[in-house]
């Protein structure tokens, strides 16, 4: 089978080329993102492989379907860039539901430590031989309260890490776990009680801007907010106002609400048009990185292997374990898992 691989980066080739020979598939790497204008590059291919910033809307789906493409392979866990109602009975859409939850949770912790102890600022100083530590004081995590929103695999691992620091952990999830060794509370209690808040939930209608002006008003002024999940979980305008008015102590972002035109690209010689992103990056207590929480060797190996396995299942006519359709719930599954029958 032939795969048109969109938004390809050099590191994608490293791991996909390592495994694709085993499957006997052909991959055409395309640097451009998938859009209506670039669908023509998939003509003659059985599948397209896409990432978080590729466009898989109705127009793109209709065009791909007419060209004979049968499968959309998401090499990521998130799927909010796909119009599932339009793809139903036209294209099978499969994702990588979990590649390395440890990678993301560990990175969230790294952001937390950097924002709290200001190691990124210390590094910048010492590079210029400035060994002054004024303004670099942080706080002990031990004994503090952490609020974790989203208790799937990543959230649960993050909770284990926070427990390791000796923190009390409060959690919120629309689908609470039954075997929790931590306390579930309301969102209001998360905002009011937490010294640290870490986001680990998917982006849905219910969670879009879950962190908003009202939430910031309820937070402690010294609280630290970490987001390694999806940018639109946070209302960017409200975040900027909260930082400007010292309503929050620090912020670590690996995702951004309008990241599509910037993240994963080299814009070092450009003048950024996104004033909100520029404003956020100007704050001394805000640390922004470019959606790299997933990026470990183990995660990339798992992404490549699972993506190719997904296509192999389709080729063989097997049950598509990682398929998503418009009937699936927010967590990316539906009753088909019980019956072992594909979405269509």
Residue ranges, per PLM feature:
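Short acidic/histidine-rich motifs immediately flanking catalytic phosphotransfer sites
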Residues: 42-47, 67-69, 192-197, 220-223
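Glycine-rich nucleotide-phosphate-binding loops and adjacent flexible coil segments
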Residues: 226
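Rossmann-like dinucleotide/phosphate-binding beta-alpha-beta segment
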Residues: 134-221, 341-344
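An N-terminal-biased, well-structured beta-alpha scaffold segment characteristic
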Residues: 2-94, 212
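A short helix->loop->beta-strand "cap" motif at the edges of active sites that frequently abuts
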Residues: 66-71, 89-91, 167, 221-223, ...
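Phosphate-binding beta-alpha-beta segment of Rossmann-like dinucleotide-binding domains, i.e.
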Residues: 89-145, 157-160, 164, 326
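Short glycine-/small-residue-rich Rossmann-like dinucleotide-binding loops
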Residues: 52-53, 195, 201-203, 229-230, ...
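Rossmann-like dinucleotide-binding domain for NAD(H)/NADP(H)
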Residues: 222, 232-344
């Amino acid at each position: 089978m032939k795969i048109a691989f969109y938004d390809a980066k050099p590191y994608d080739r490293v791991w996909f080329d390592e495994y694709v020979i085993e499957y006997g598939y052909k991959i055409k790497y395309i640097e451009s993102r998938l859009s209506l204008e670039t669908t023509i590059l998939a003509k003659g291919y059985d599948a397209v492989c896409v990432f978080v910033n590729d466009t898989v809307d109705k127009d793109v789906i209709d065009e791909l379907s007419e060209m004979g493409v049968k499968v959309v392979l998401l090499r990521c866990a998130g799927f909010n860039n796909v119009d599932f109602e339009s793809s139903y009975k036209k294209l099978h859409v499969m994702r990588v539901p979990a590649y390395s939850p440890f990678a993301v949770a560990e990175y969230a912790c790294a952001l937390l430590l950097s924002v709290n102890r200001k190691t990124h600022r210390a590094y910048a100083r010492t590079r210029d031989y400035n060994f002054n530590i004024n303004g670099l004081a942080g706080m002990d995590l031990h004994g503090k309260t952490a609020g974790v929103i989203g208790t799937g695999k990543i959230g649960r691992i993050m909770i284990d890490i926070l427990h390791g620091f000796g923190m009390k952990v409060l959690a919120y999830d629309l689908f609470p776990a039954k075997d929790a060794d931590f306390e579930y509370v309301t969102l209001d209690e998360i905002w009011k009680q937490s010294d640290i808040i870490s986001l680990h939930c998917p982006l849905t209608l219910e969670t879009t801007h879950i962190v908003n002006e009202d939430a910031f008003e309820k937070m402690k002024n010294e609280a630290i907010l970490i987001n390694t999940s999806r940018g639109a979980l946070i209302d960017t305008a409200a975040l900027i106002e909260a930082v400007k008015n010292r309503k929050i102590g620090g912020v670590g972002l690996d995702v951004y609400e309008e990241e599509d035109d910037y993240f994963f690209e080299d814009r070092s010689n450009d003048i950024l048009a996104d004033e909100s992103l520029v404003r956020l990056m100007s704050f001394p207590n805000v640390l922004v990185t470019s959606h790299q929480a997933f990026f470990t060797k183990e995660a990339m190996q798992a992404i490549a292997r699972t993506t190719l396995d997904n296509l192999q299942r389709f080729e063989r006519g097997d049950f598509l374990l990682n398929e998503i359709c418009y009937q699936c719930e927010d967590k990316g599954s539906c009753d088909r898992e019980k019956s072992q029958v594909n979405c269509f």
